């Protein structure tokens, strides 16, 4: 549903008829940035050099002034480069790549422009109450806020509420691009089949949606291979009995300061009940969500976004 928003140019690199790398260049109307993504390369500096030189040359021929990556076509698909904890299996929603890719990017003129973290939290004991988050939840409840999990019969309504909140609150994120509500629904409609709605929270004030926190059971990369019947069975099993949860999306209307900790408190209540570990996924440096539950953080995943100006010799004249 997103292909109408951009133009994607795919490339494959061969050495003696053997595939040694691939990449894609994505461009958007009225945007001077070329987005480099779908990056794969063997561990050979010479091959990486060819990829980045060809990518920059092509971006320049298109009239672009800079490159940013890795971005697999869209903010709504996948972006960022993983840079640590490669001994751990990928969690759902995690960008995953070879450990040496960072060096290949930086050796070829890219610099880190954004840094992100994911927090891995150990299970919360049932008796382990947290006064900060519990008190914040109680305080907002007393003020008339309602924080609750949606009912599956209301999924379509809640999806519309999420669209309005998420597209407004995420609009200042790097590489963010708008999309229509119709296409948003196409992207997120299938989530109804993988969510446990007890771990999805919506916040309302005077019956208006003002915040959200969306968690999914950790399916690893199985949700990307739904054509495999065995994966479908594993997904159904994990949905019924998750091993951990991934908190993928969170946002609060800026006129309701402090509500984020109340939303976090409502999820902590659920985590105390189920006794499962969790991951607070992909928070950008400077965002308050990076610090949520910091007393319970066991490990810290790190990711980056990189950029490079297109060299003058590659730029299209006029």
Task: Show where each model-derived region lies.
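Catalytic cores of nucleotide-enabled group-transfer and carboxylate-activating enzymes in metabolic
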Residues: 1-23, 28-35, 41-42, 46, ...
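Flexible loop/turn segments at secondary-structure boundaries
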Residues: 75-77, 186, 209-211, 218-224, ...
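Beta-sheet entry/capping signal
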Residues: 10, 22, 33, 64-70, ...
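Short, flexible loop/turn elements at secondary-structure junctions
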Residues: 15, 27-29, 40-43, 71-73, ...
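Acyl-donor binding region in acyl/amide transferases
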Residues: 31-109, 229-295
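Acyltransferase donor/substrate-recognition loop-hinge adjacent to the catalytic core
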Residues: 95-173
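C-terminal "cap" of GNAT-fold acetyltransferases
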Residues: 120-136, 300-318
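A conserved beta-strand-loop-helix scaffold within acyl/acetyltransferase catalytic domains
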Residues: 1-31, 149-250
């Amino acid at each position: 549903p997103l292909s109408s928003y951009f133009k994607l140019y795919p490339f494959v690199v061969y050495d003696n008829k053997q595939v040694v790398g691939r990449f894609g260049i994505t461009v958007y109307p009225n945007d001077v940035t070329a987005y480099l993504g779908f990056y794969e390369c063997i561990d050979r500096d010479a091959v990486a050099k060819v990829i980045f030189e060809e990518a920059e040359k092509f971006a320049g021929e298109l009239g672009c002034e800079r490159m940013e990556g890795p971005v697999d076509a869209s903010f709504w698909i996948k972006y960022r480069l993983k840079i640590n904890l490669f001994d751990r299996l990928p969690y759902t929603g995690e960008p995953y790549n070879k450990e040496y890719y960072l060096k290949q990017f930086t050796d070829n003129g890219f610099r880190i422009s954004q840094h992100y973290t994911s927090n891995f939290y150990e299970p919360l004991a049932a008796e382990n109450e947290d006064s900060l988050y519990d008190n914040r939840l109680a305080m907002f409840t007393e003020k008339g806020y309602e924080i609750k999990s949606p009912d599956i019969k209301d999924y379509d309504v809640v999806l519309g509420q999420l669209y309005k909140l998420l597209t407004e609150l995420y609009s200042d994120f790097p590489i963010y691009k708008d999309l229509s509500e119709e296409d948003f629904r196409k992207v997120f409609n299938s989530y109804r089949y993988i969510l446990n709605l007890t771990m999805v929270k919506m916040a309302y004030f005077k019956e208006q949606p003002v915040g959200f926190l969306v968690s999914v059971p950790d399916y690893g990369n199985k949700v990307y291979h739904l054509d495999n019947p065995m994966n479908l069975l594993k997904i159904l099993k994990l949905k019924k009995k998750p091993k951990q949860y991934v908190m993928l999306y969170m946002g609060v209307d800026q006129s309701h300061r402090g509500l984020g900790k109340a939303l976090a408190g409502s999820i902590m209540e659920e985590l105390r009940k189920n006794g499962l570990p969790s991951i607070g996924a992909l928070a950008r440096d400077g965002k308050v969500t990076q610090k949520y539950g910091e007393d319970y953080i066991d490990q810290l995943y790190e990711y980056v976004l990189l950029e490079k100006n297109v060299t003058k010799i590659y730029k299209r004249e006029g």
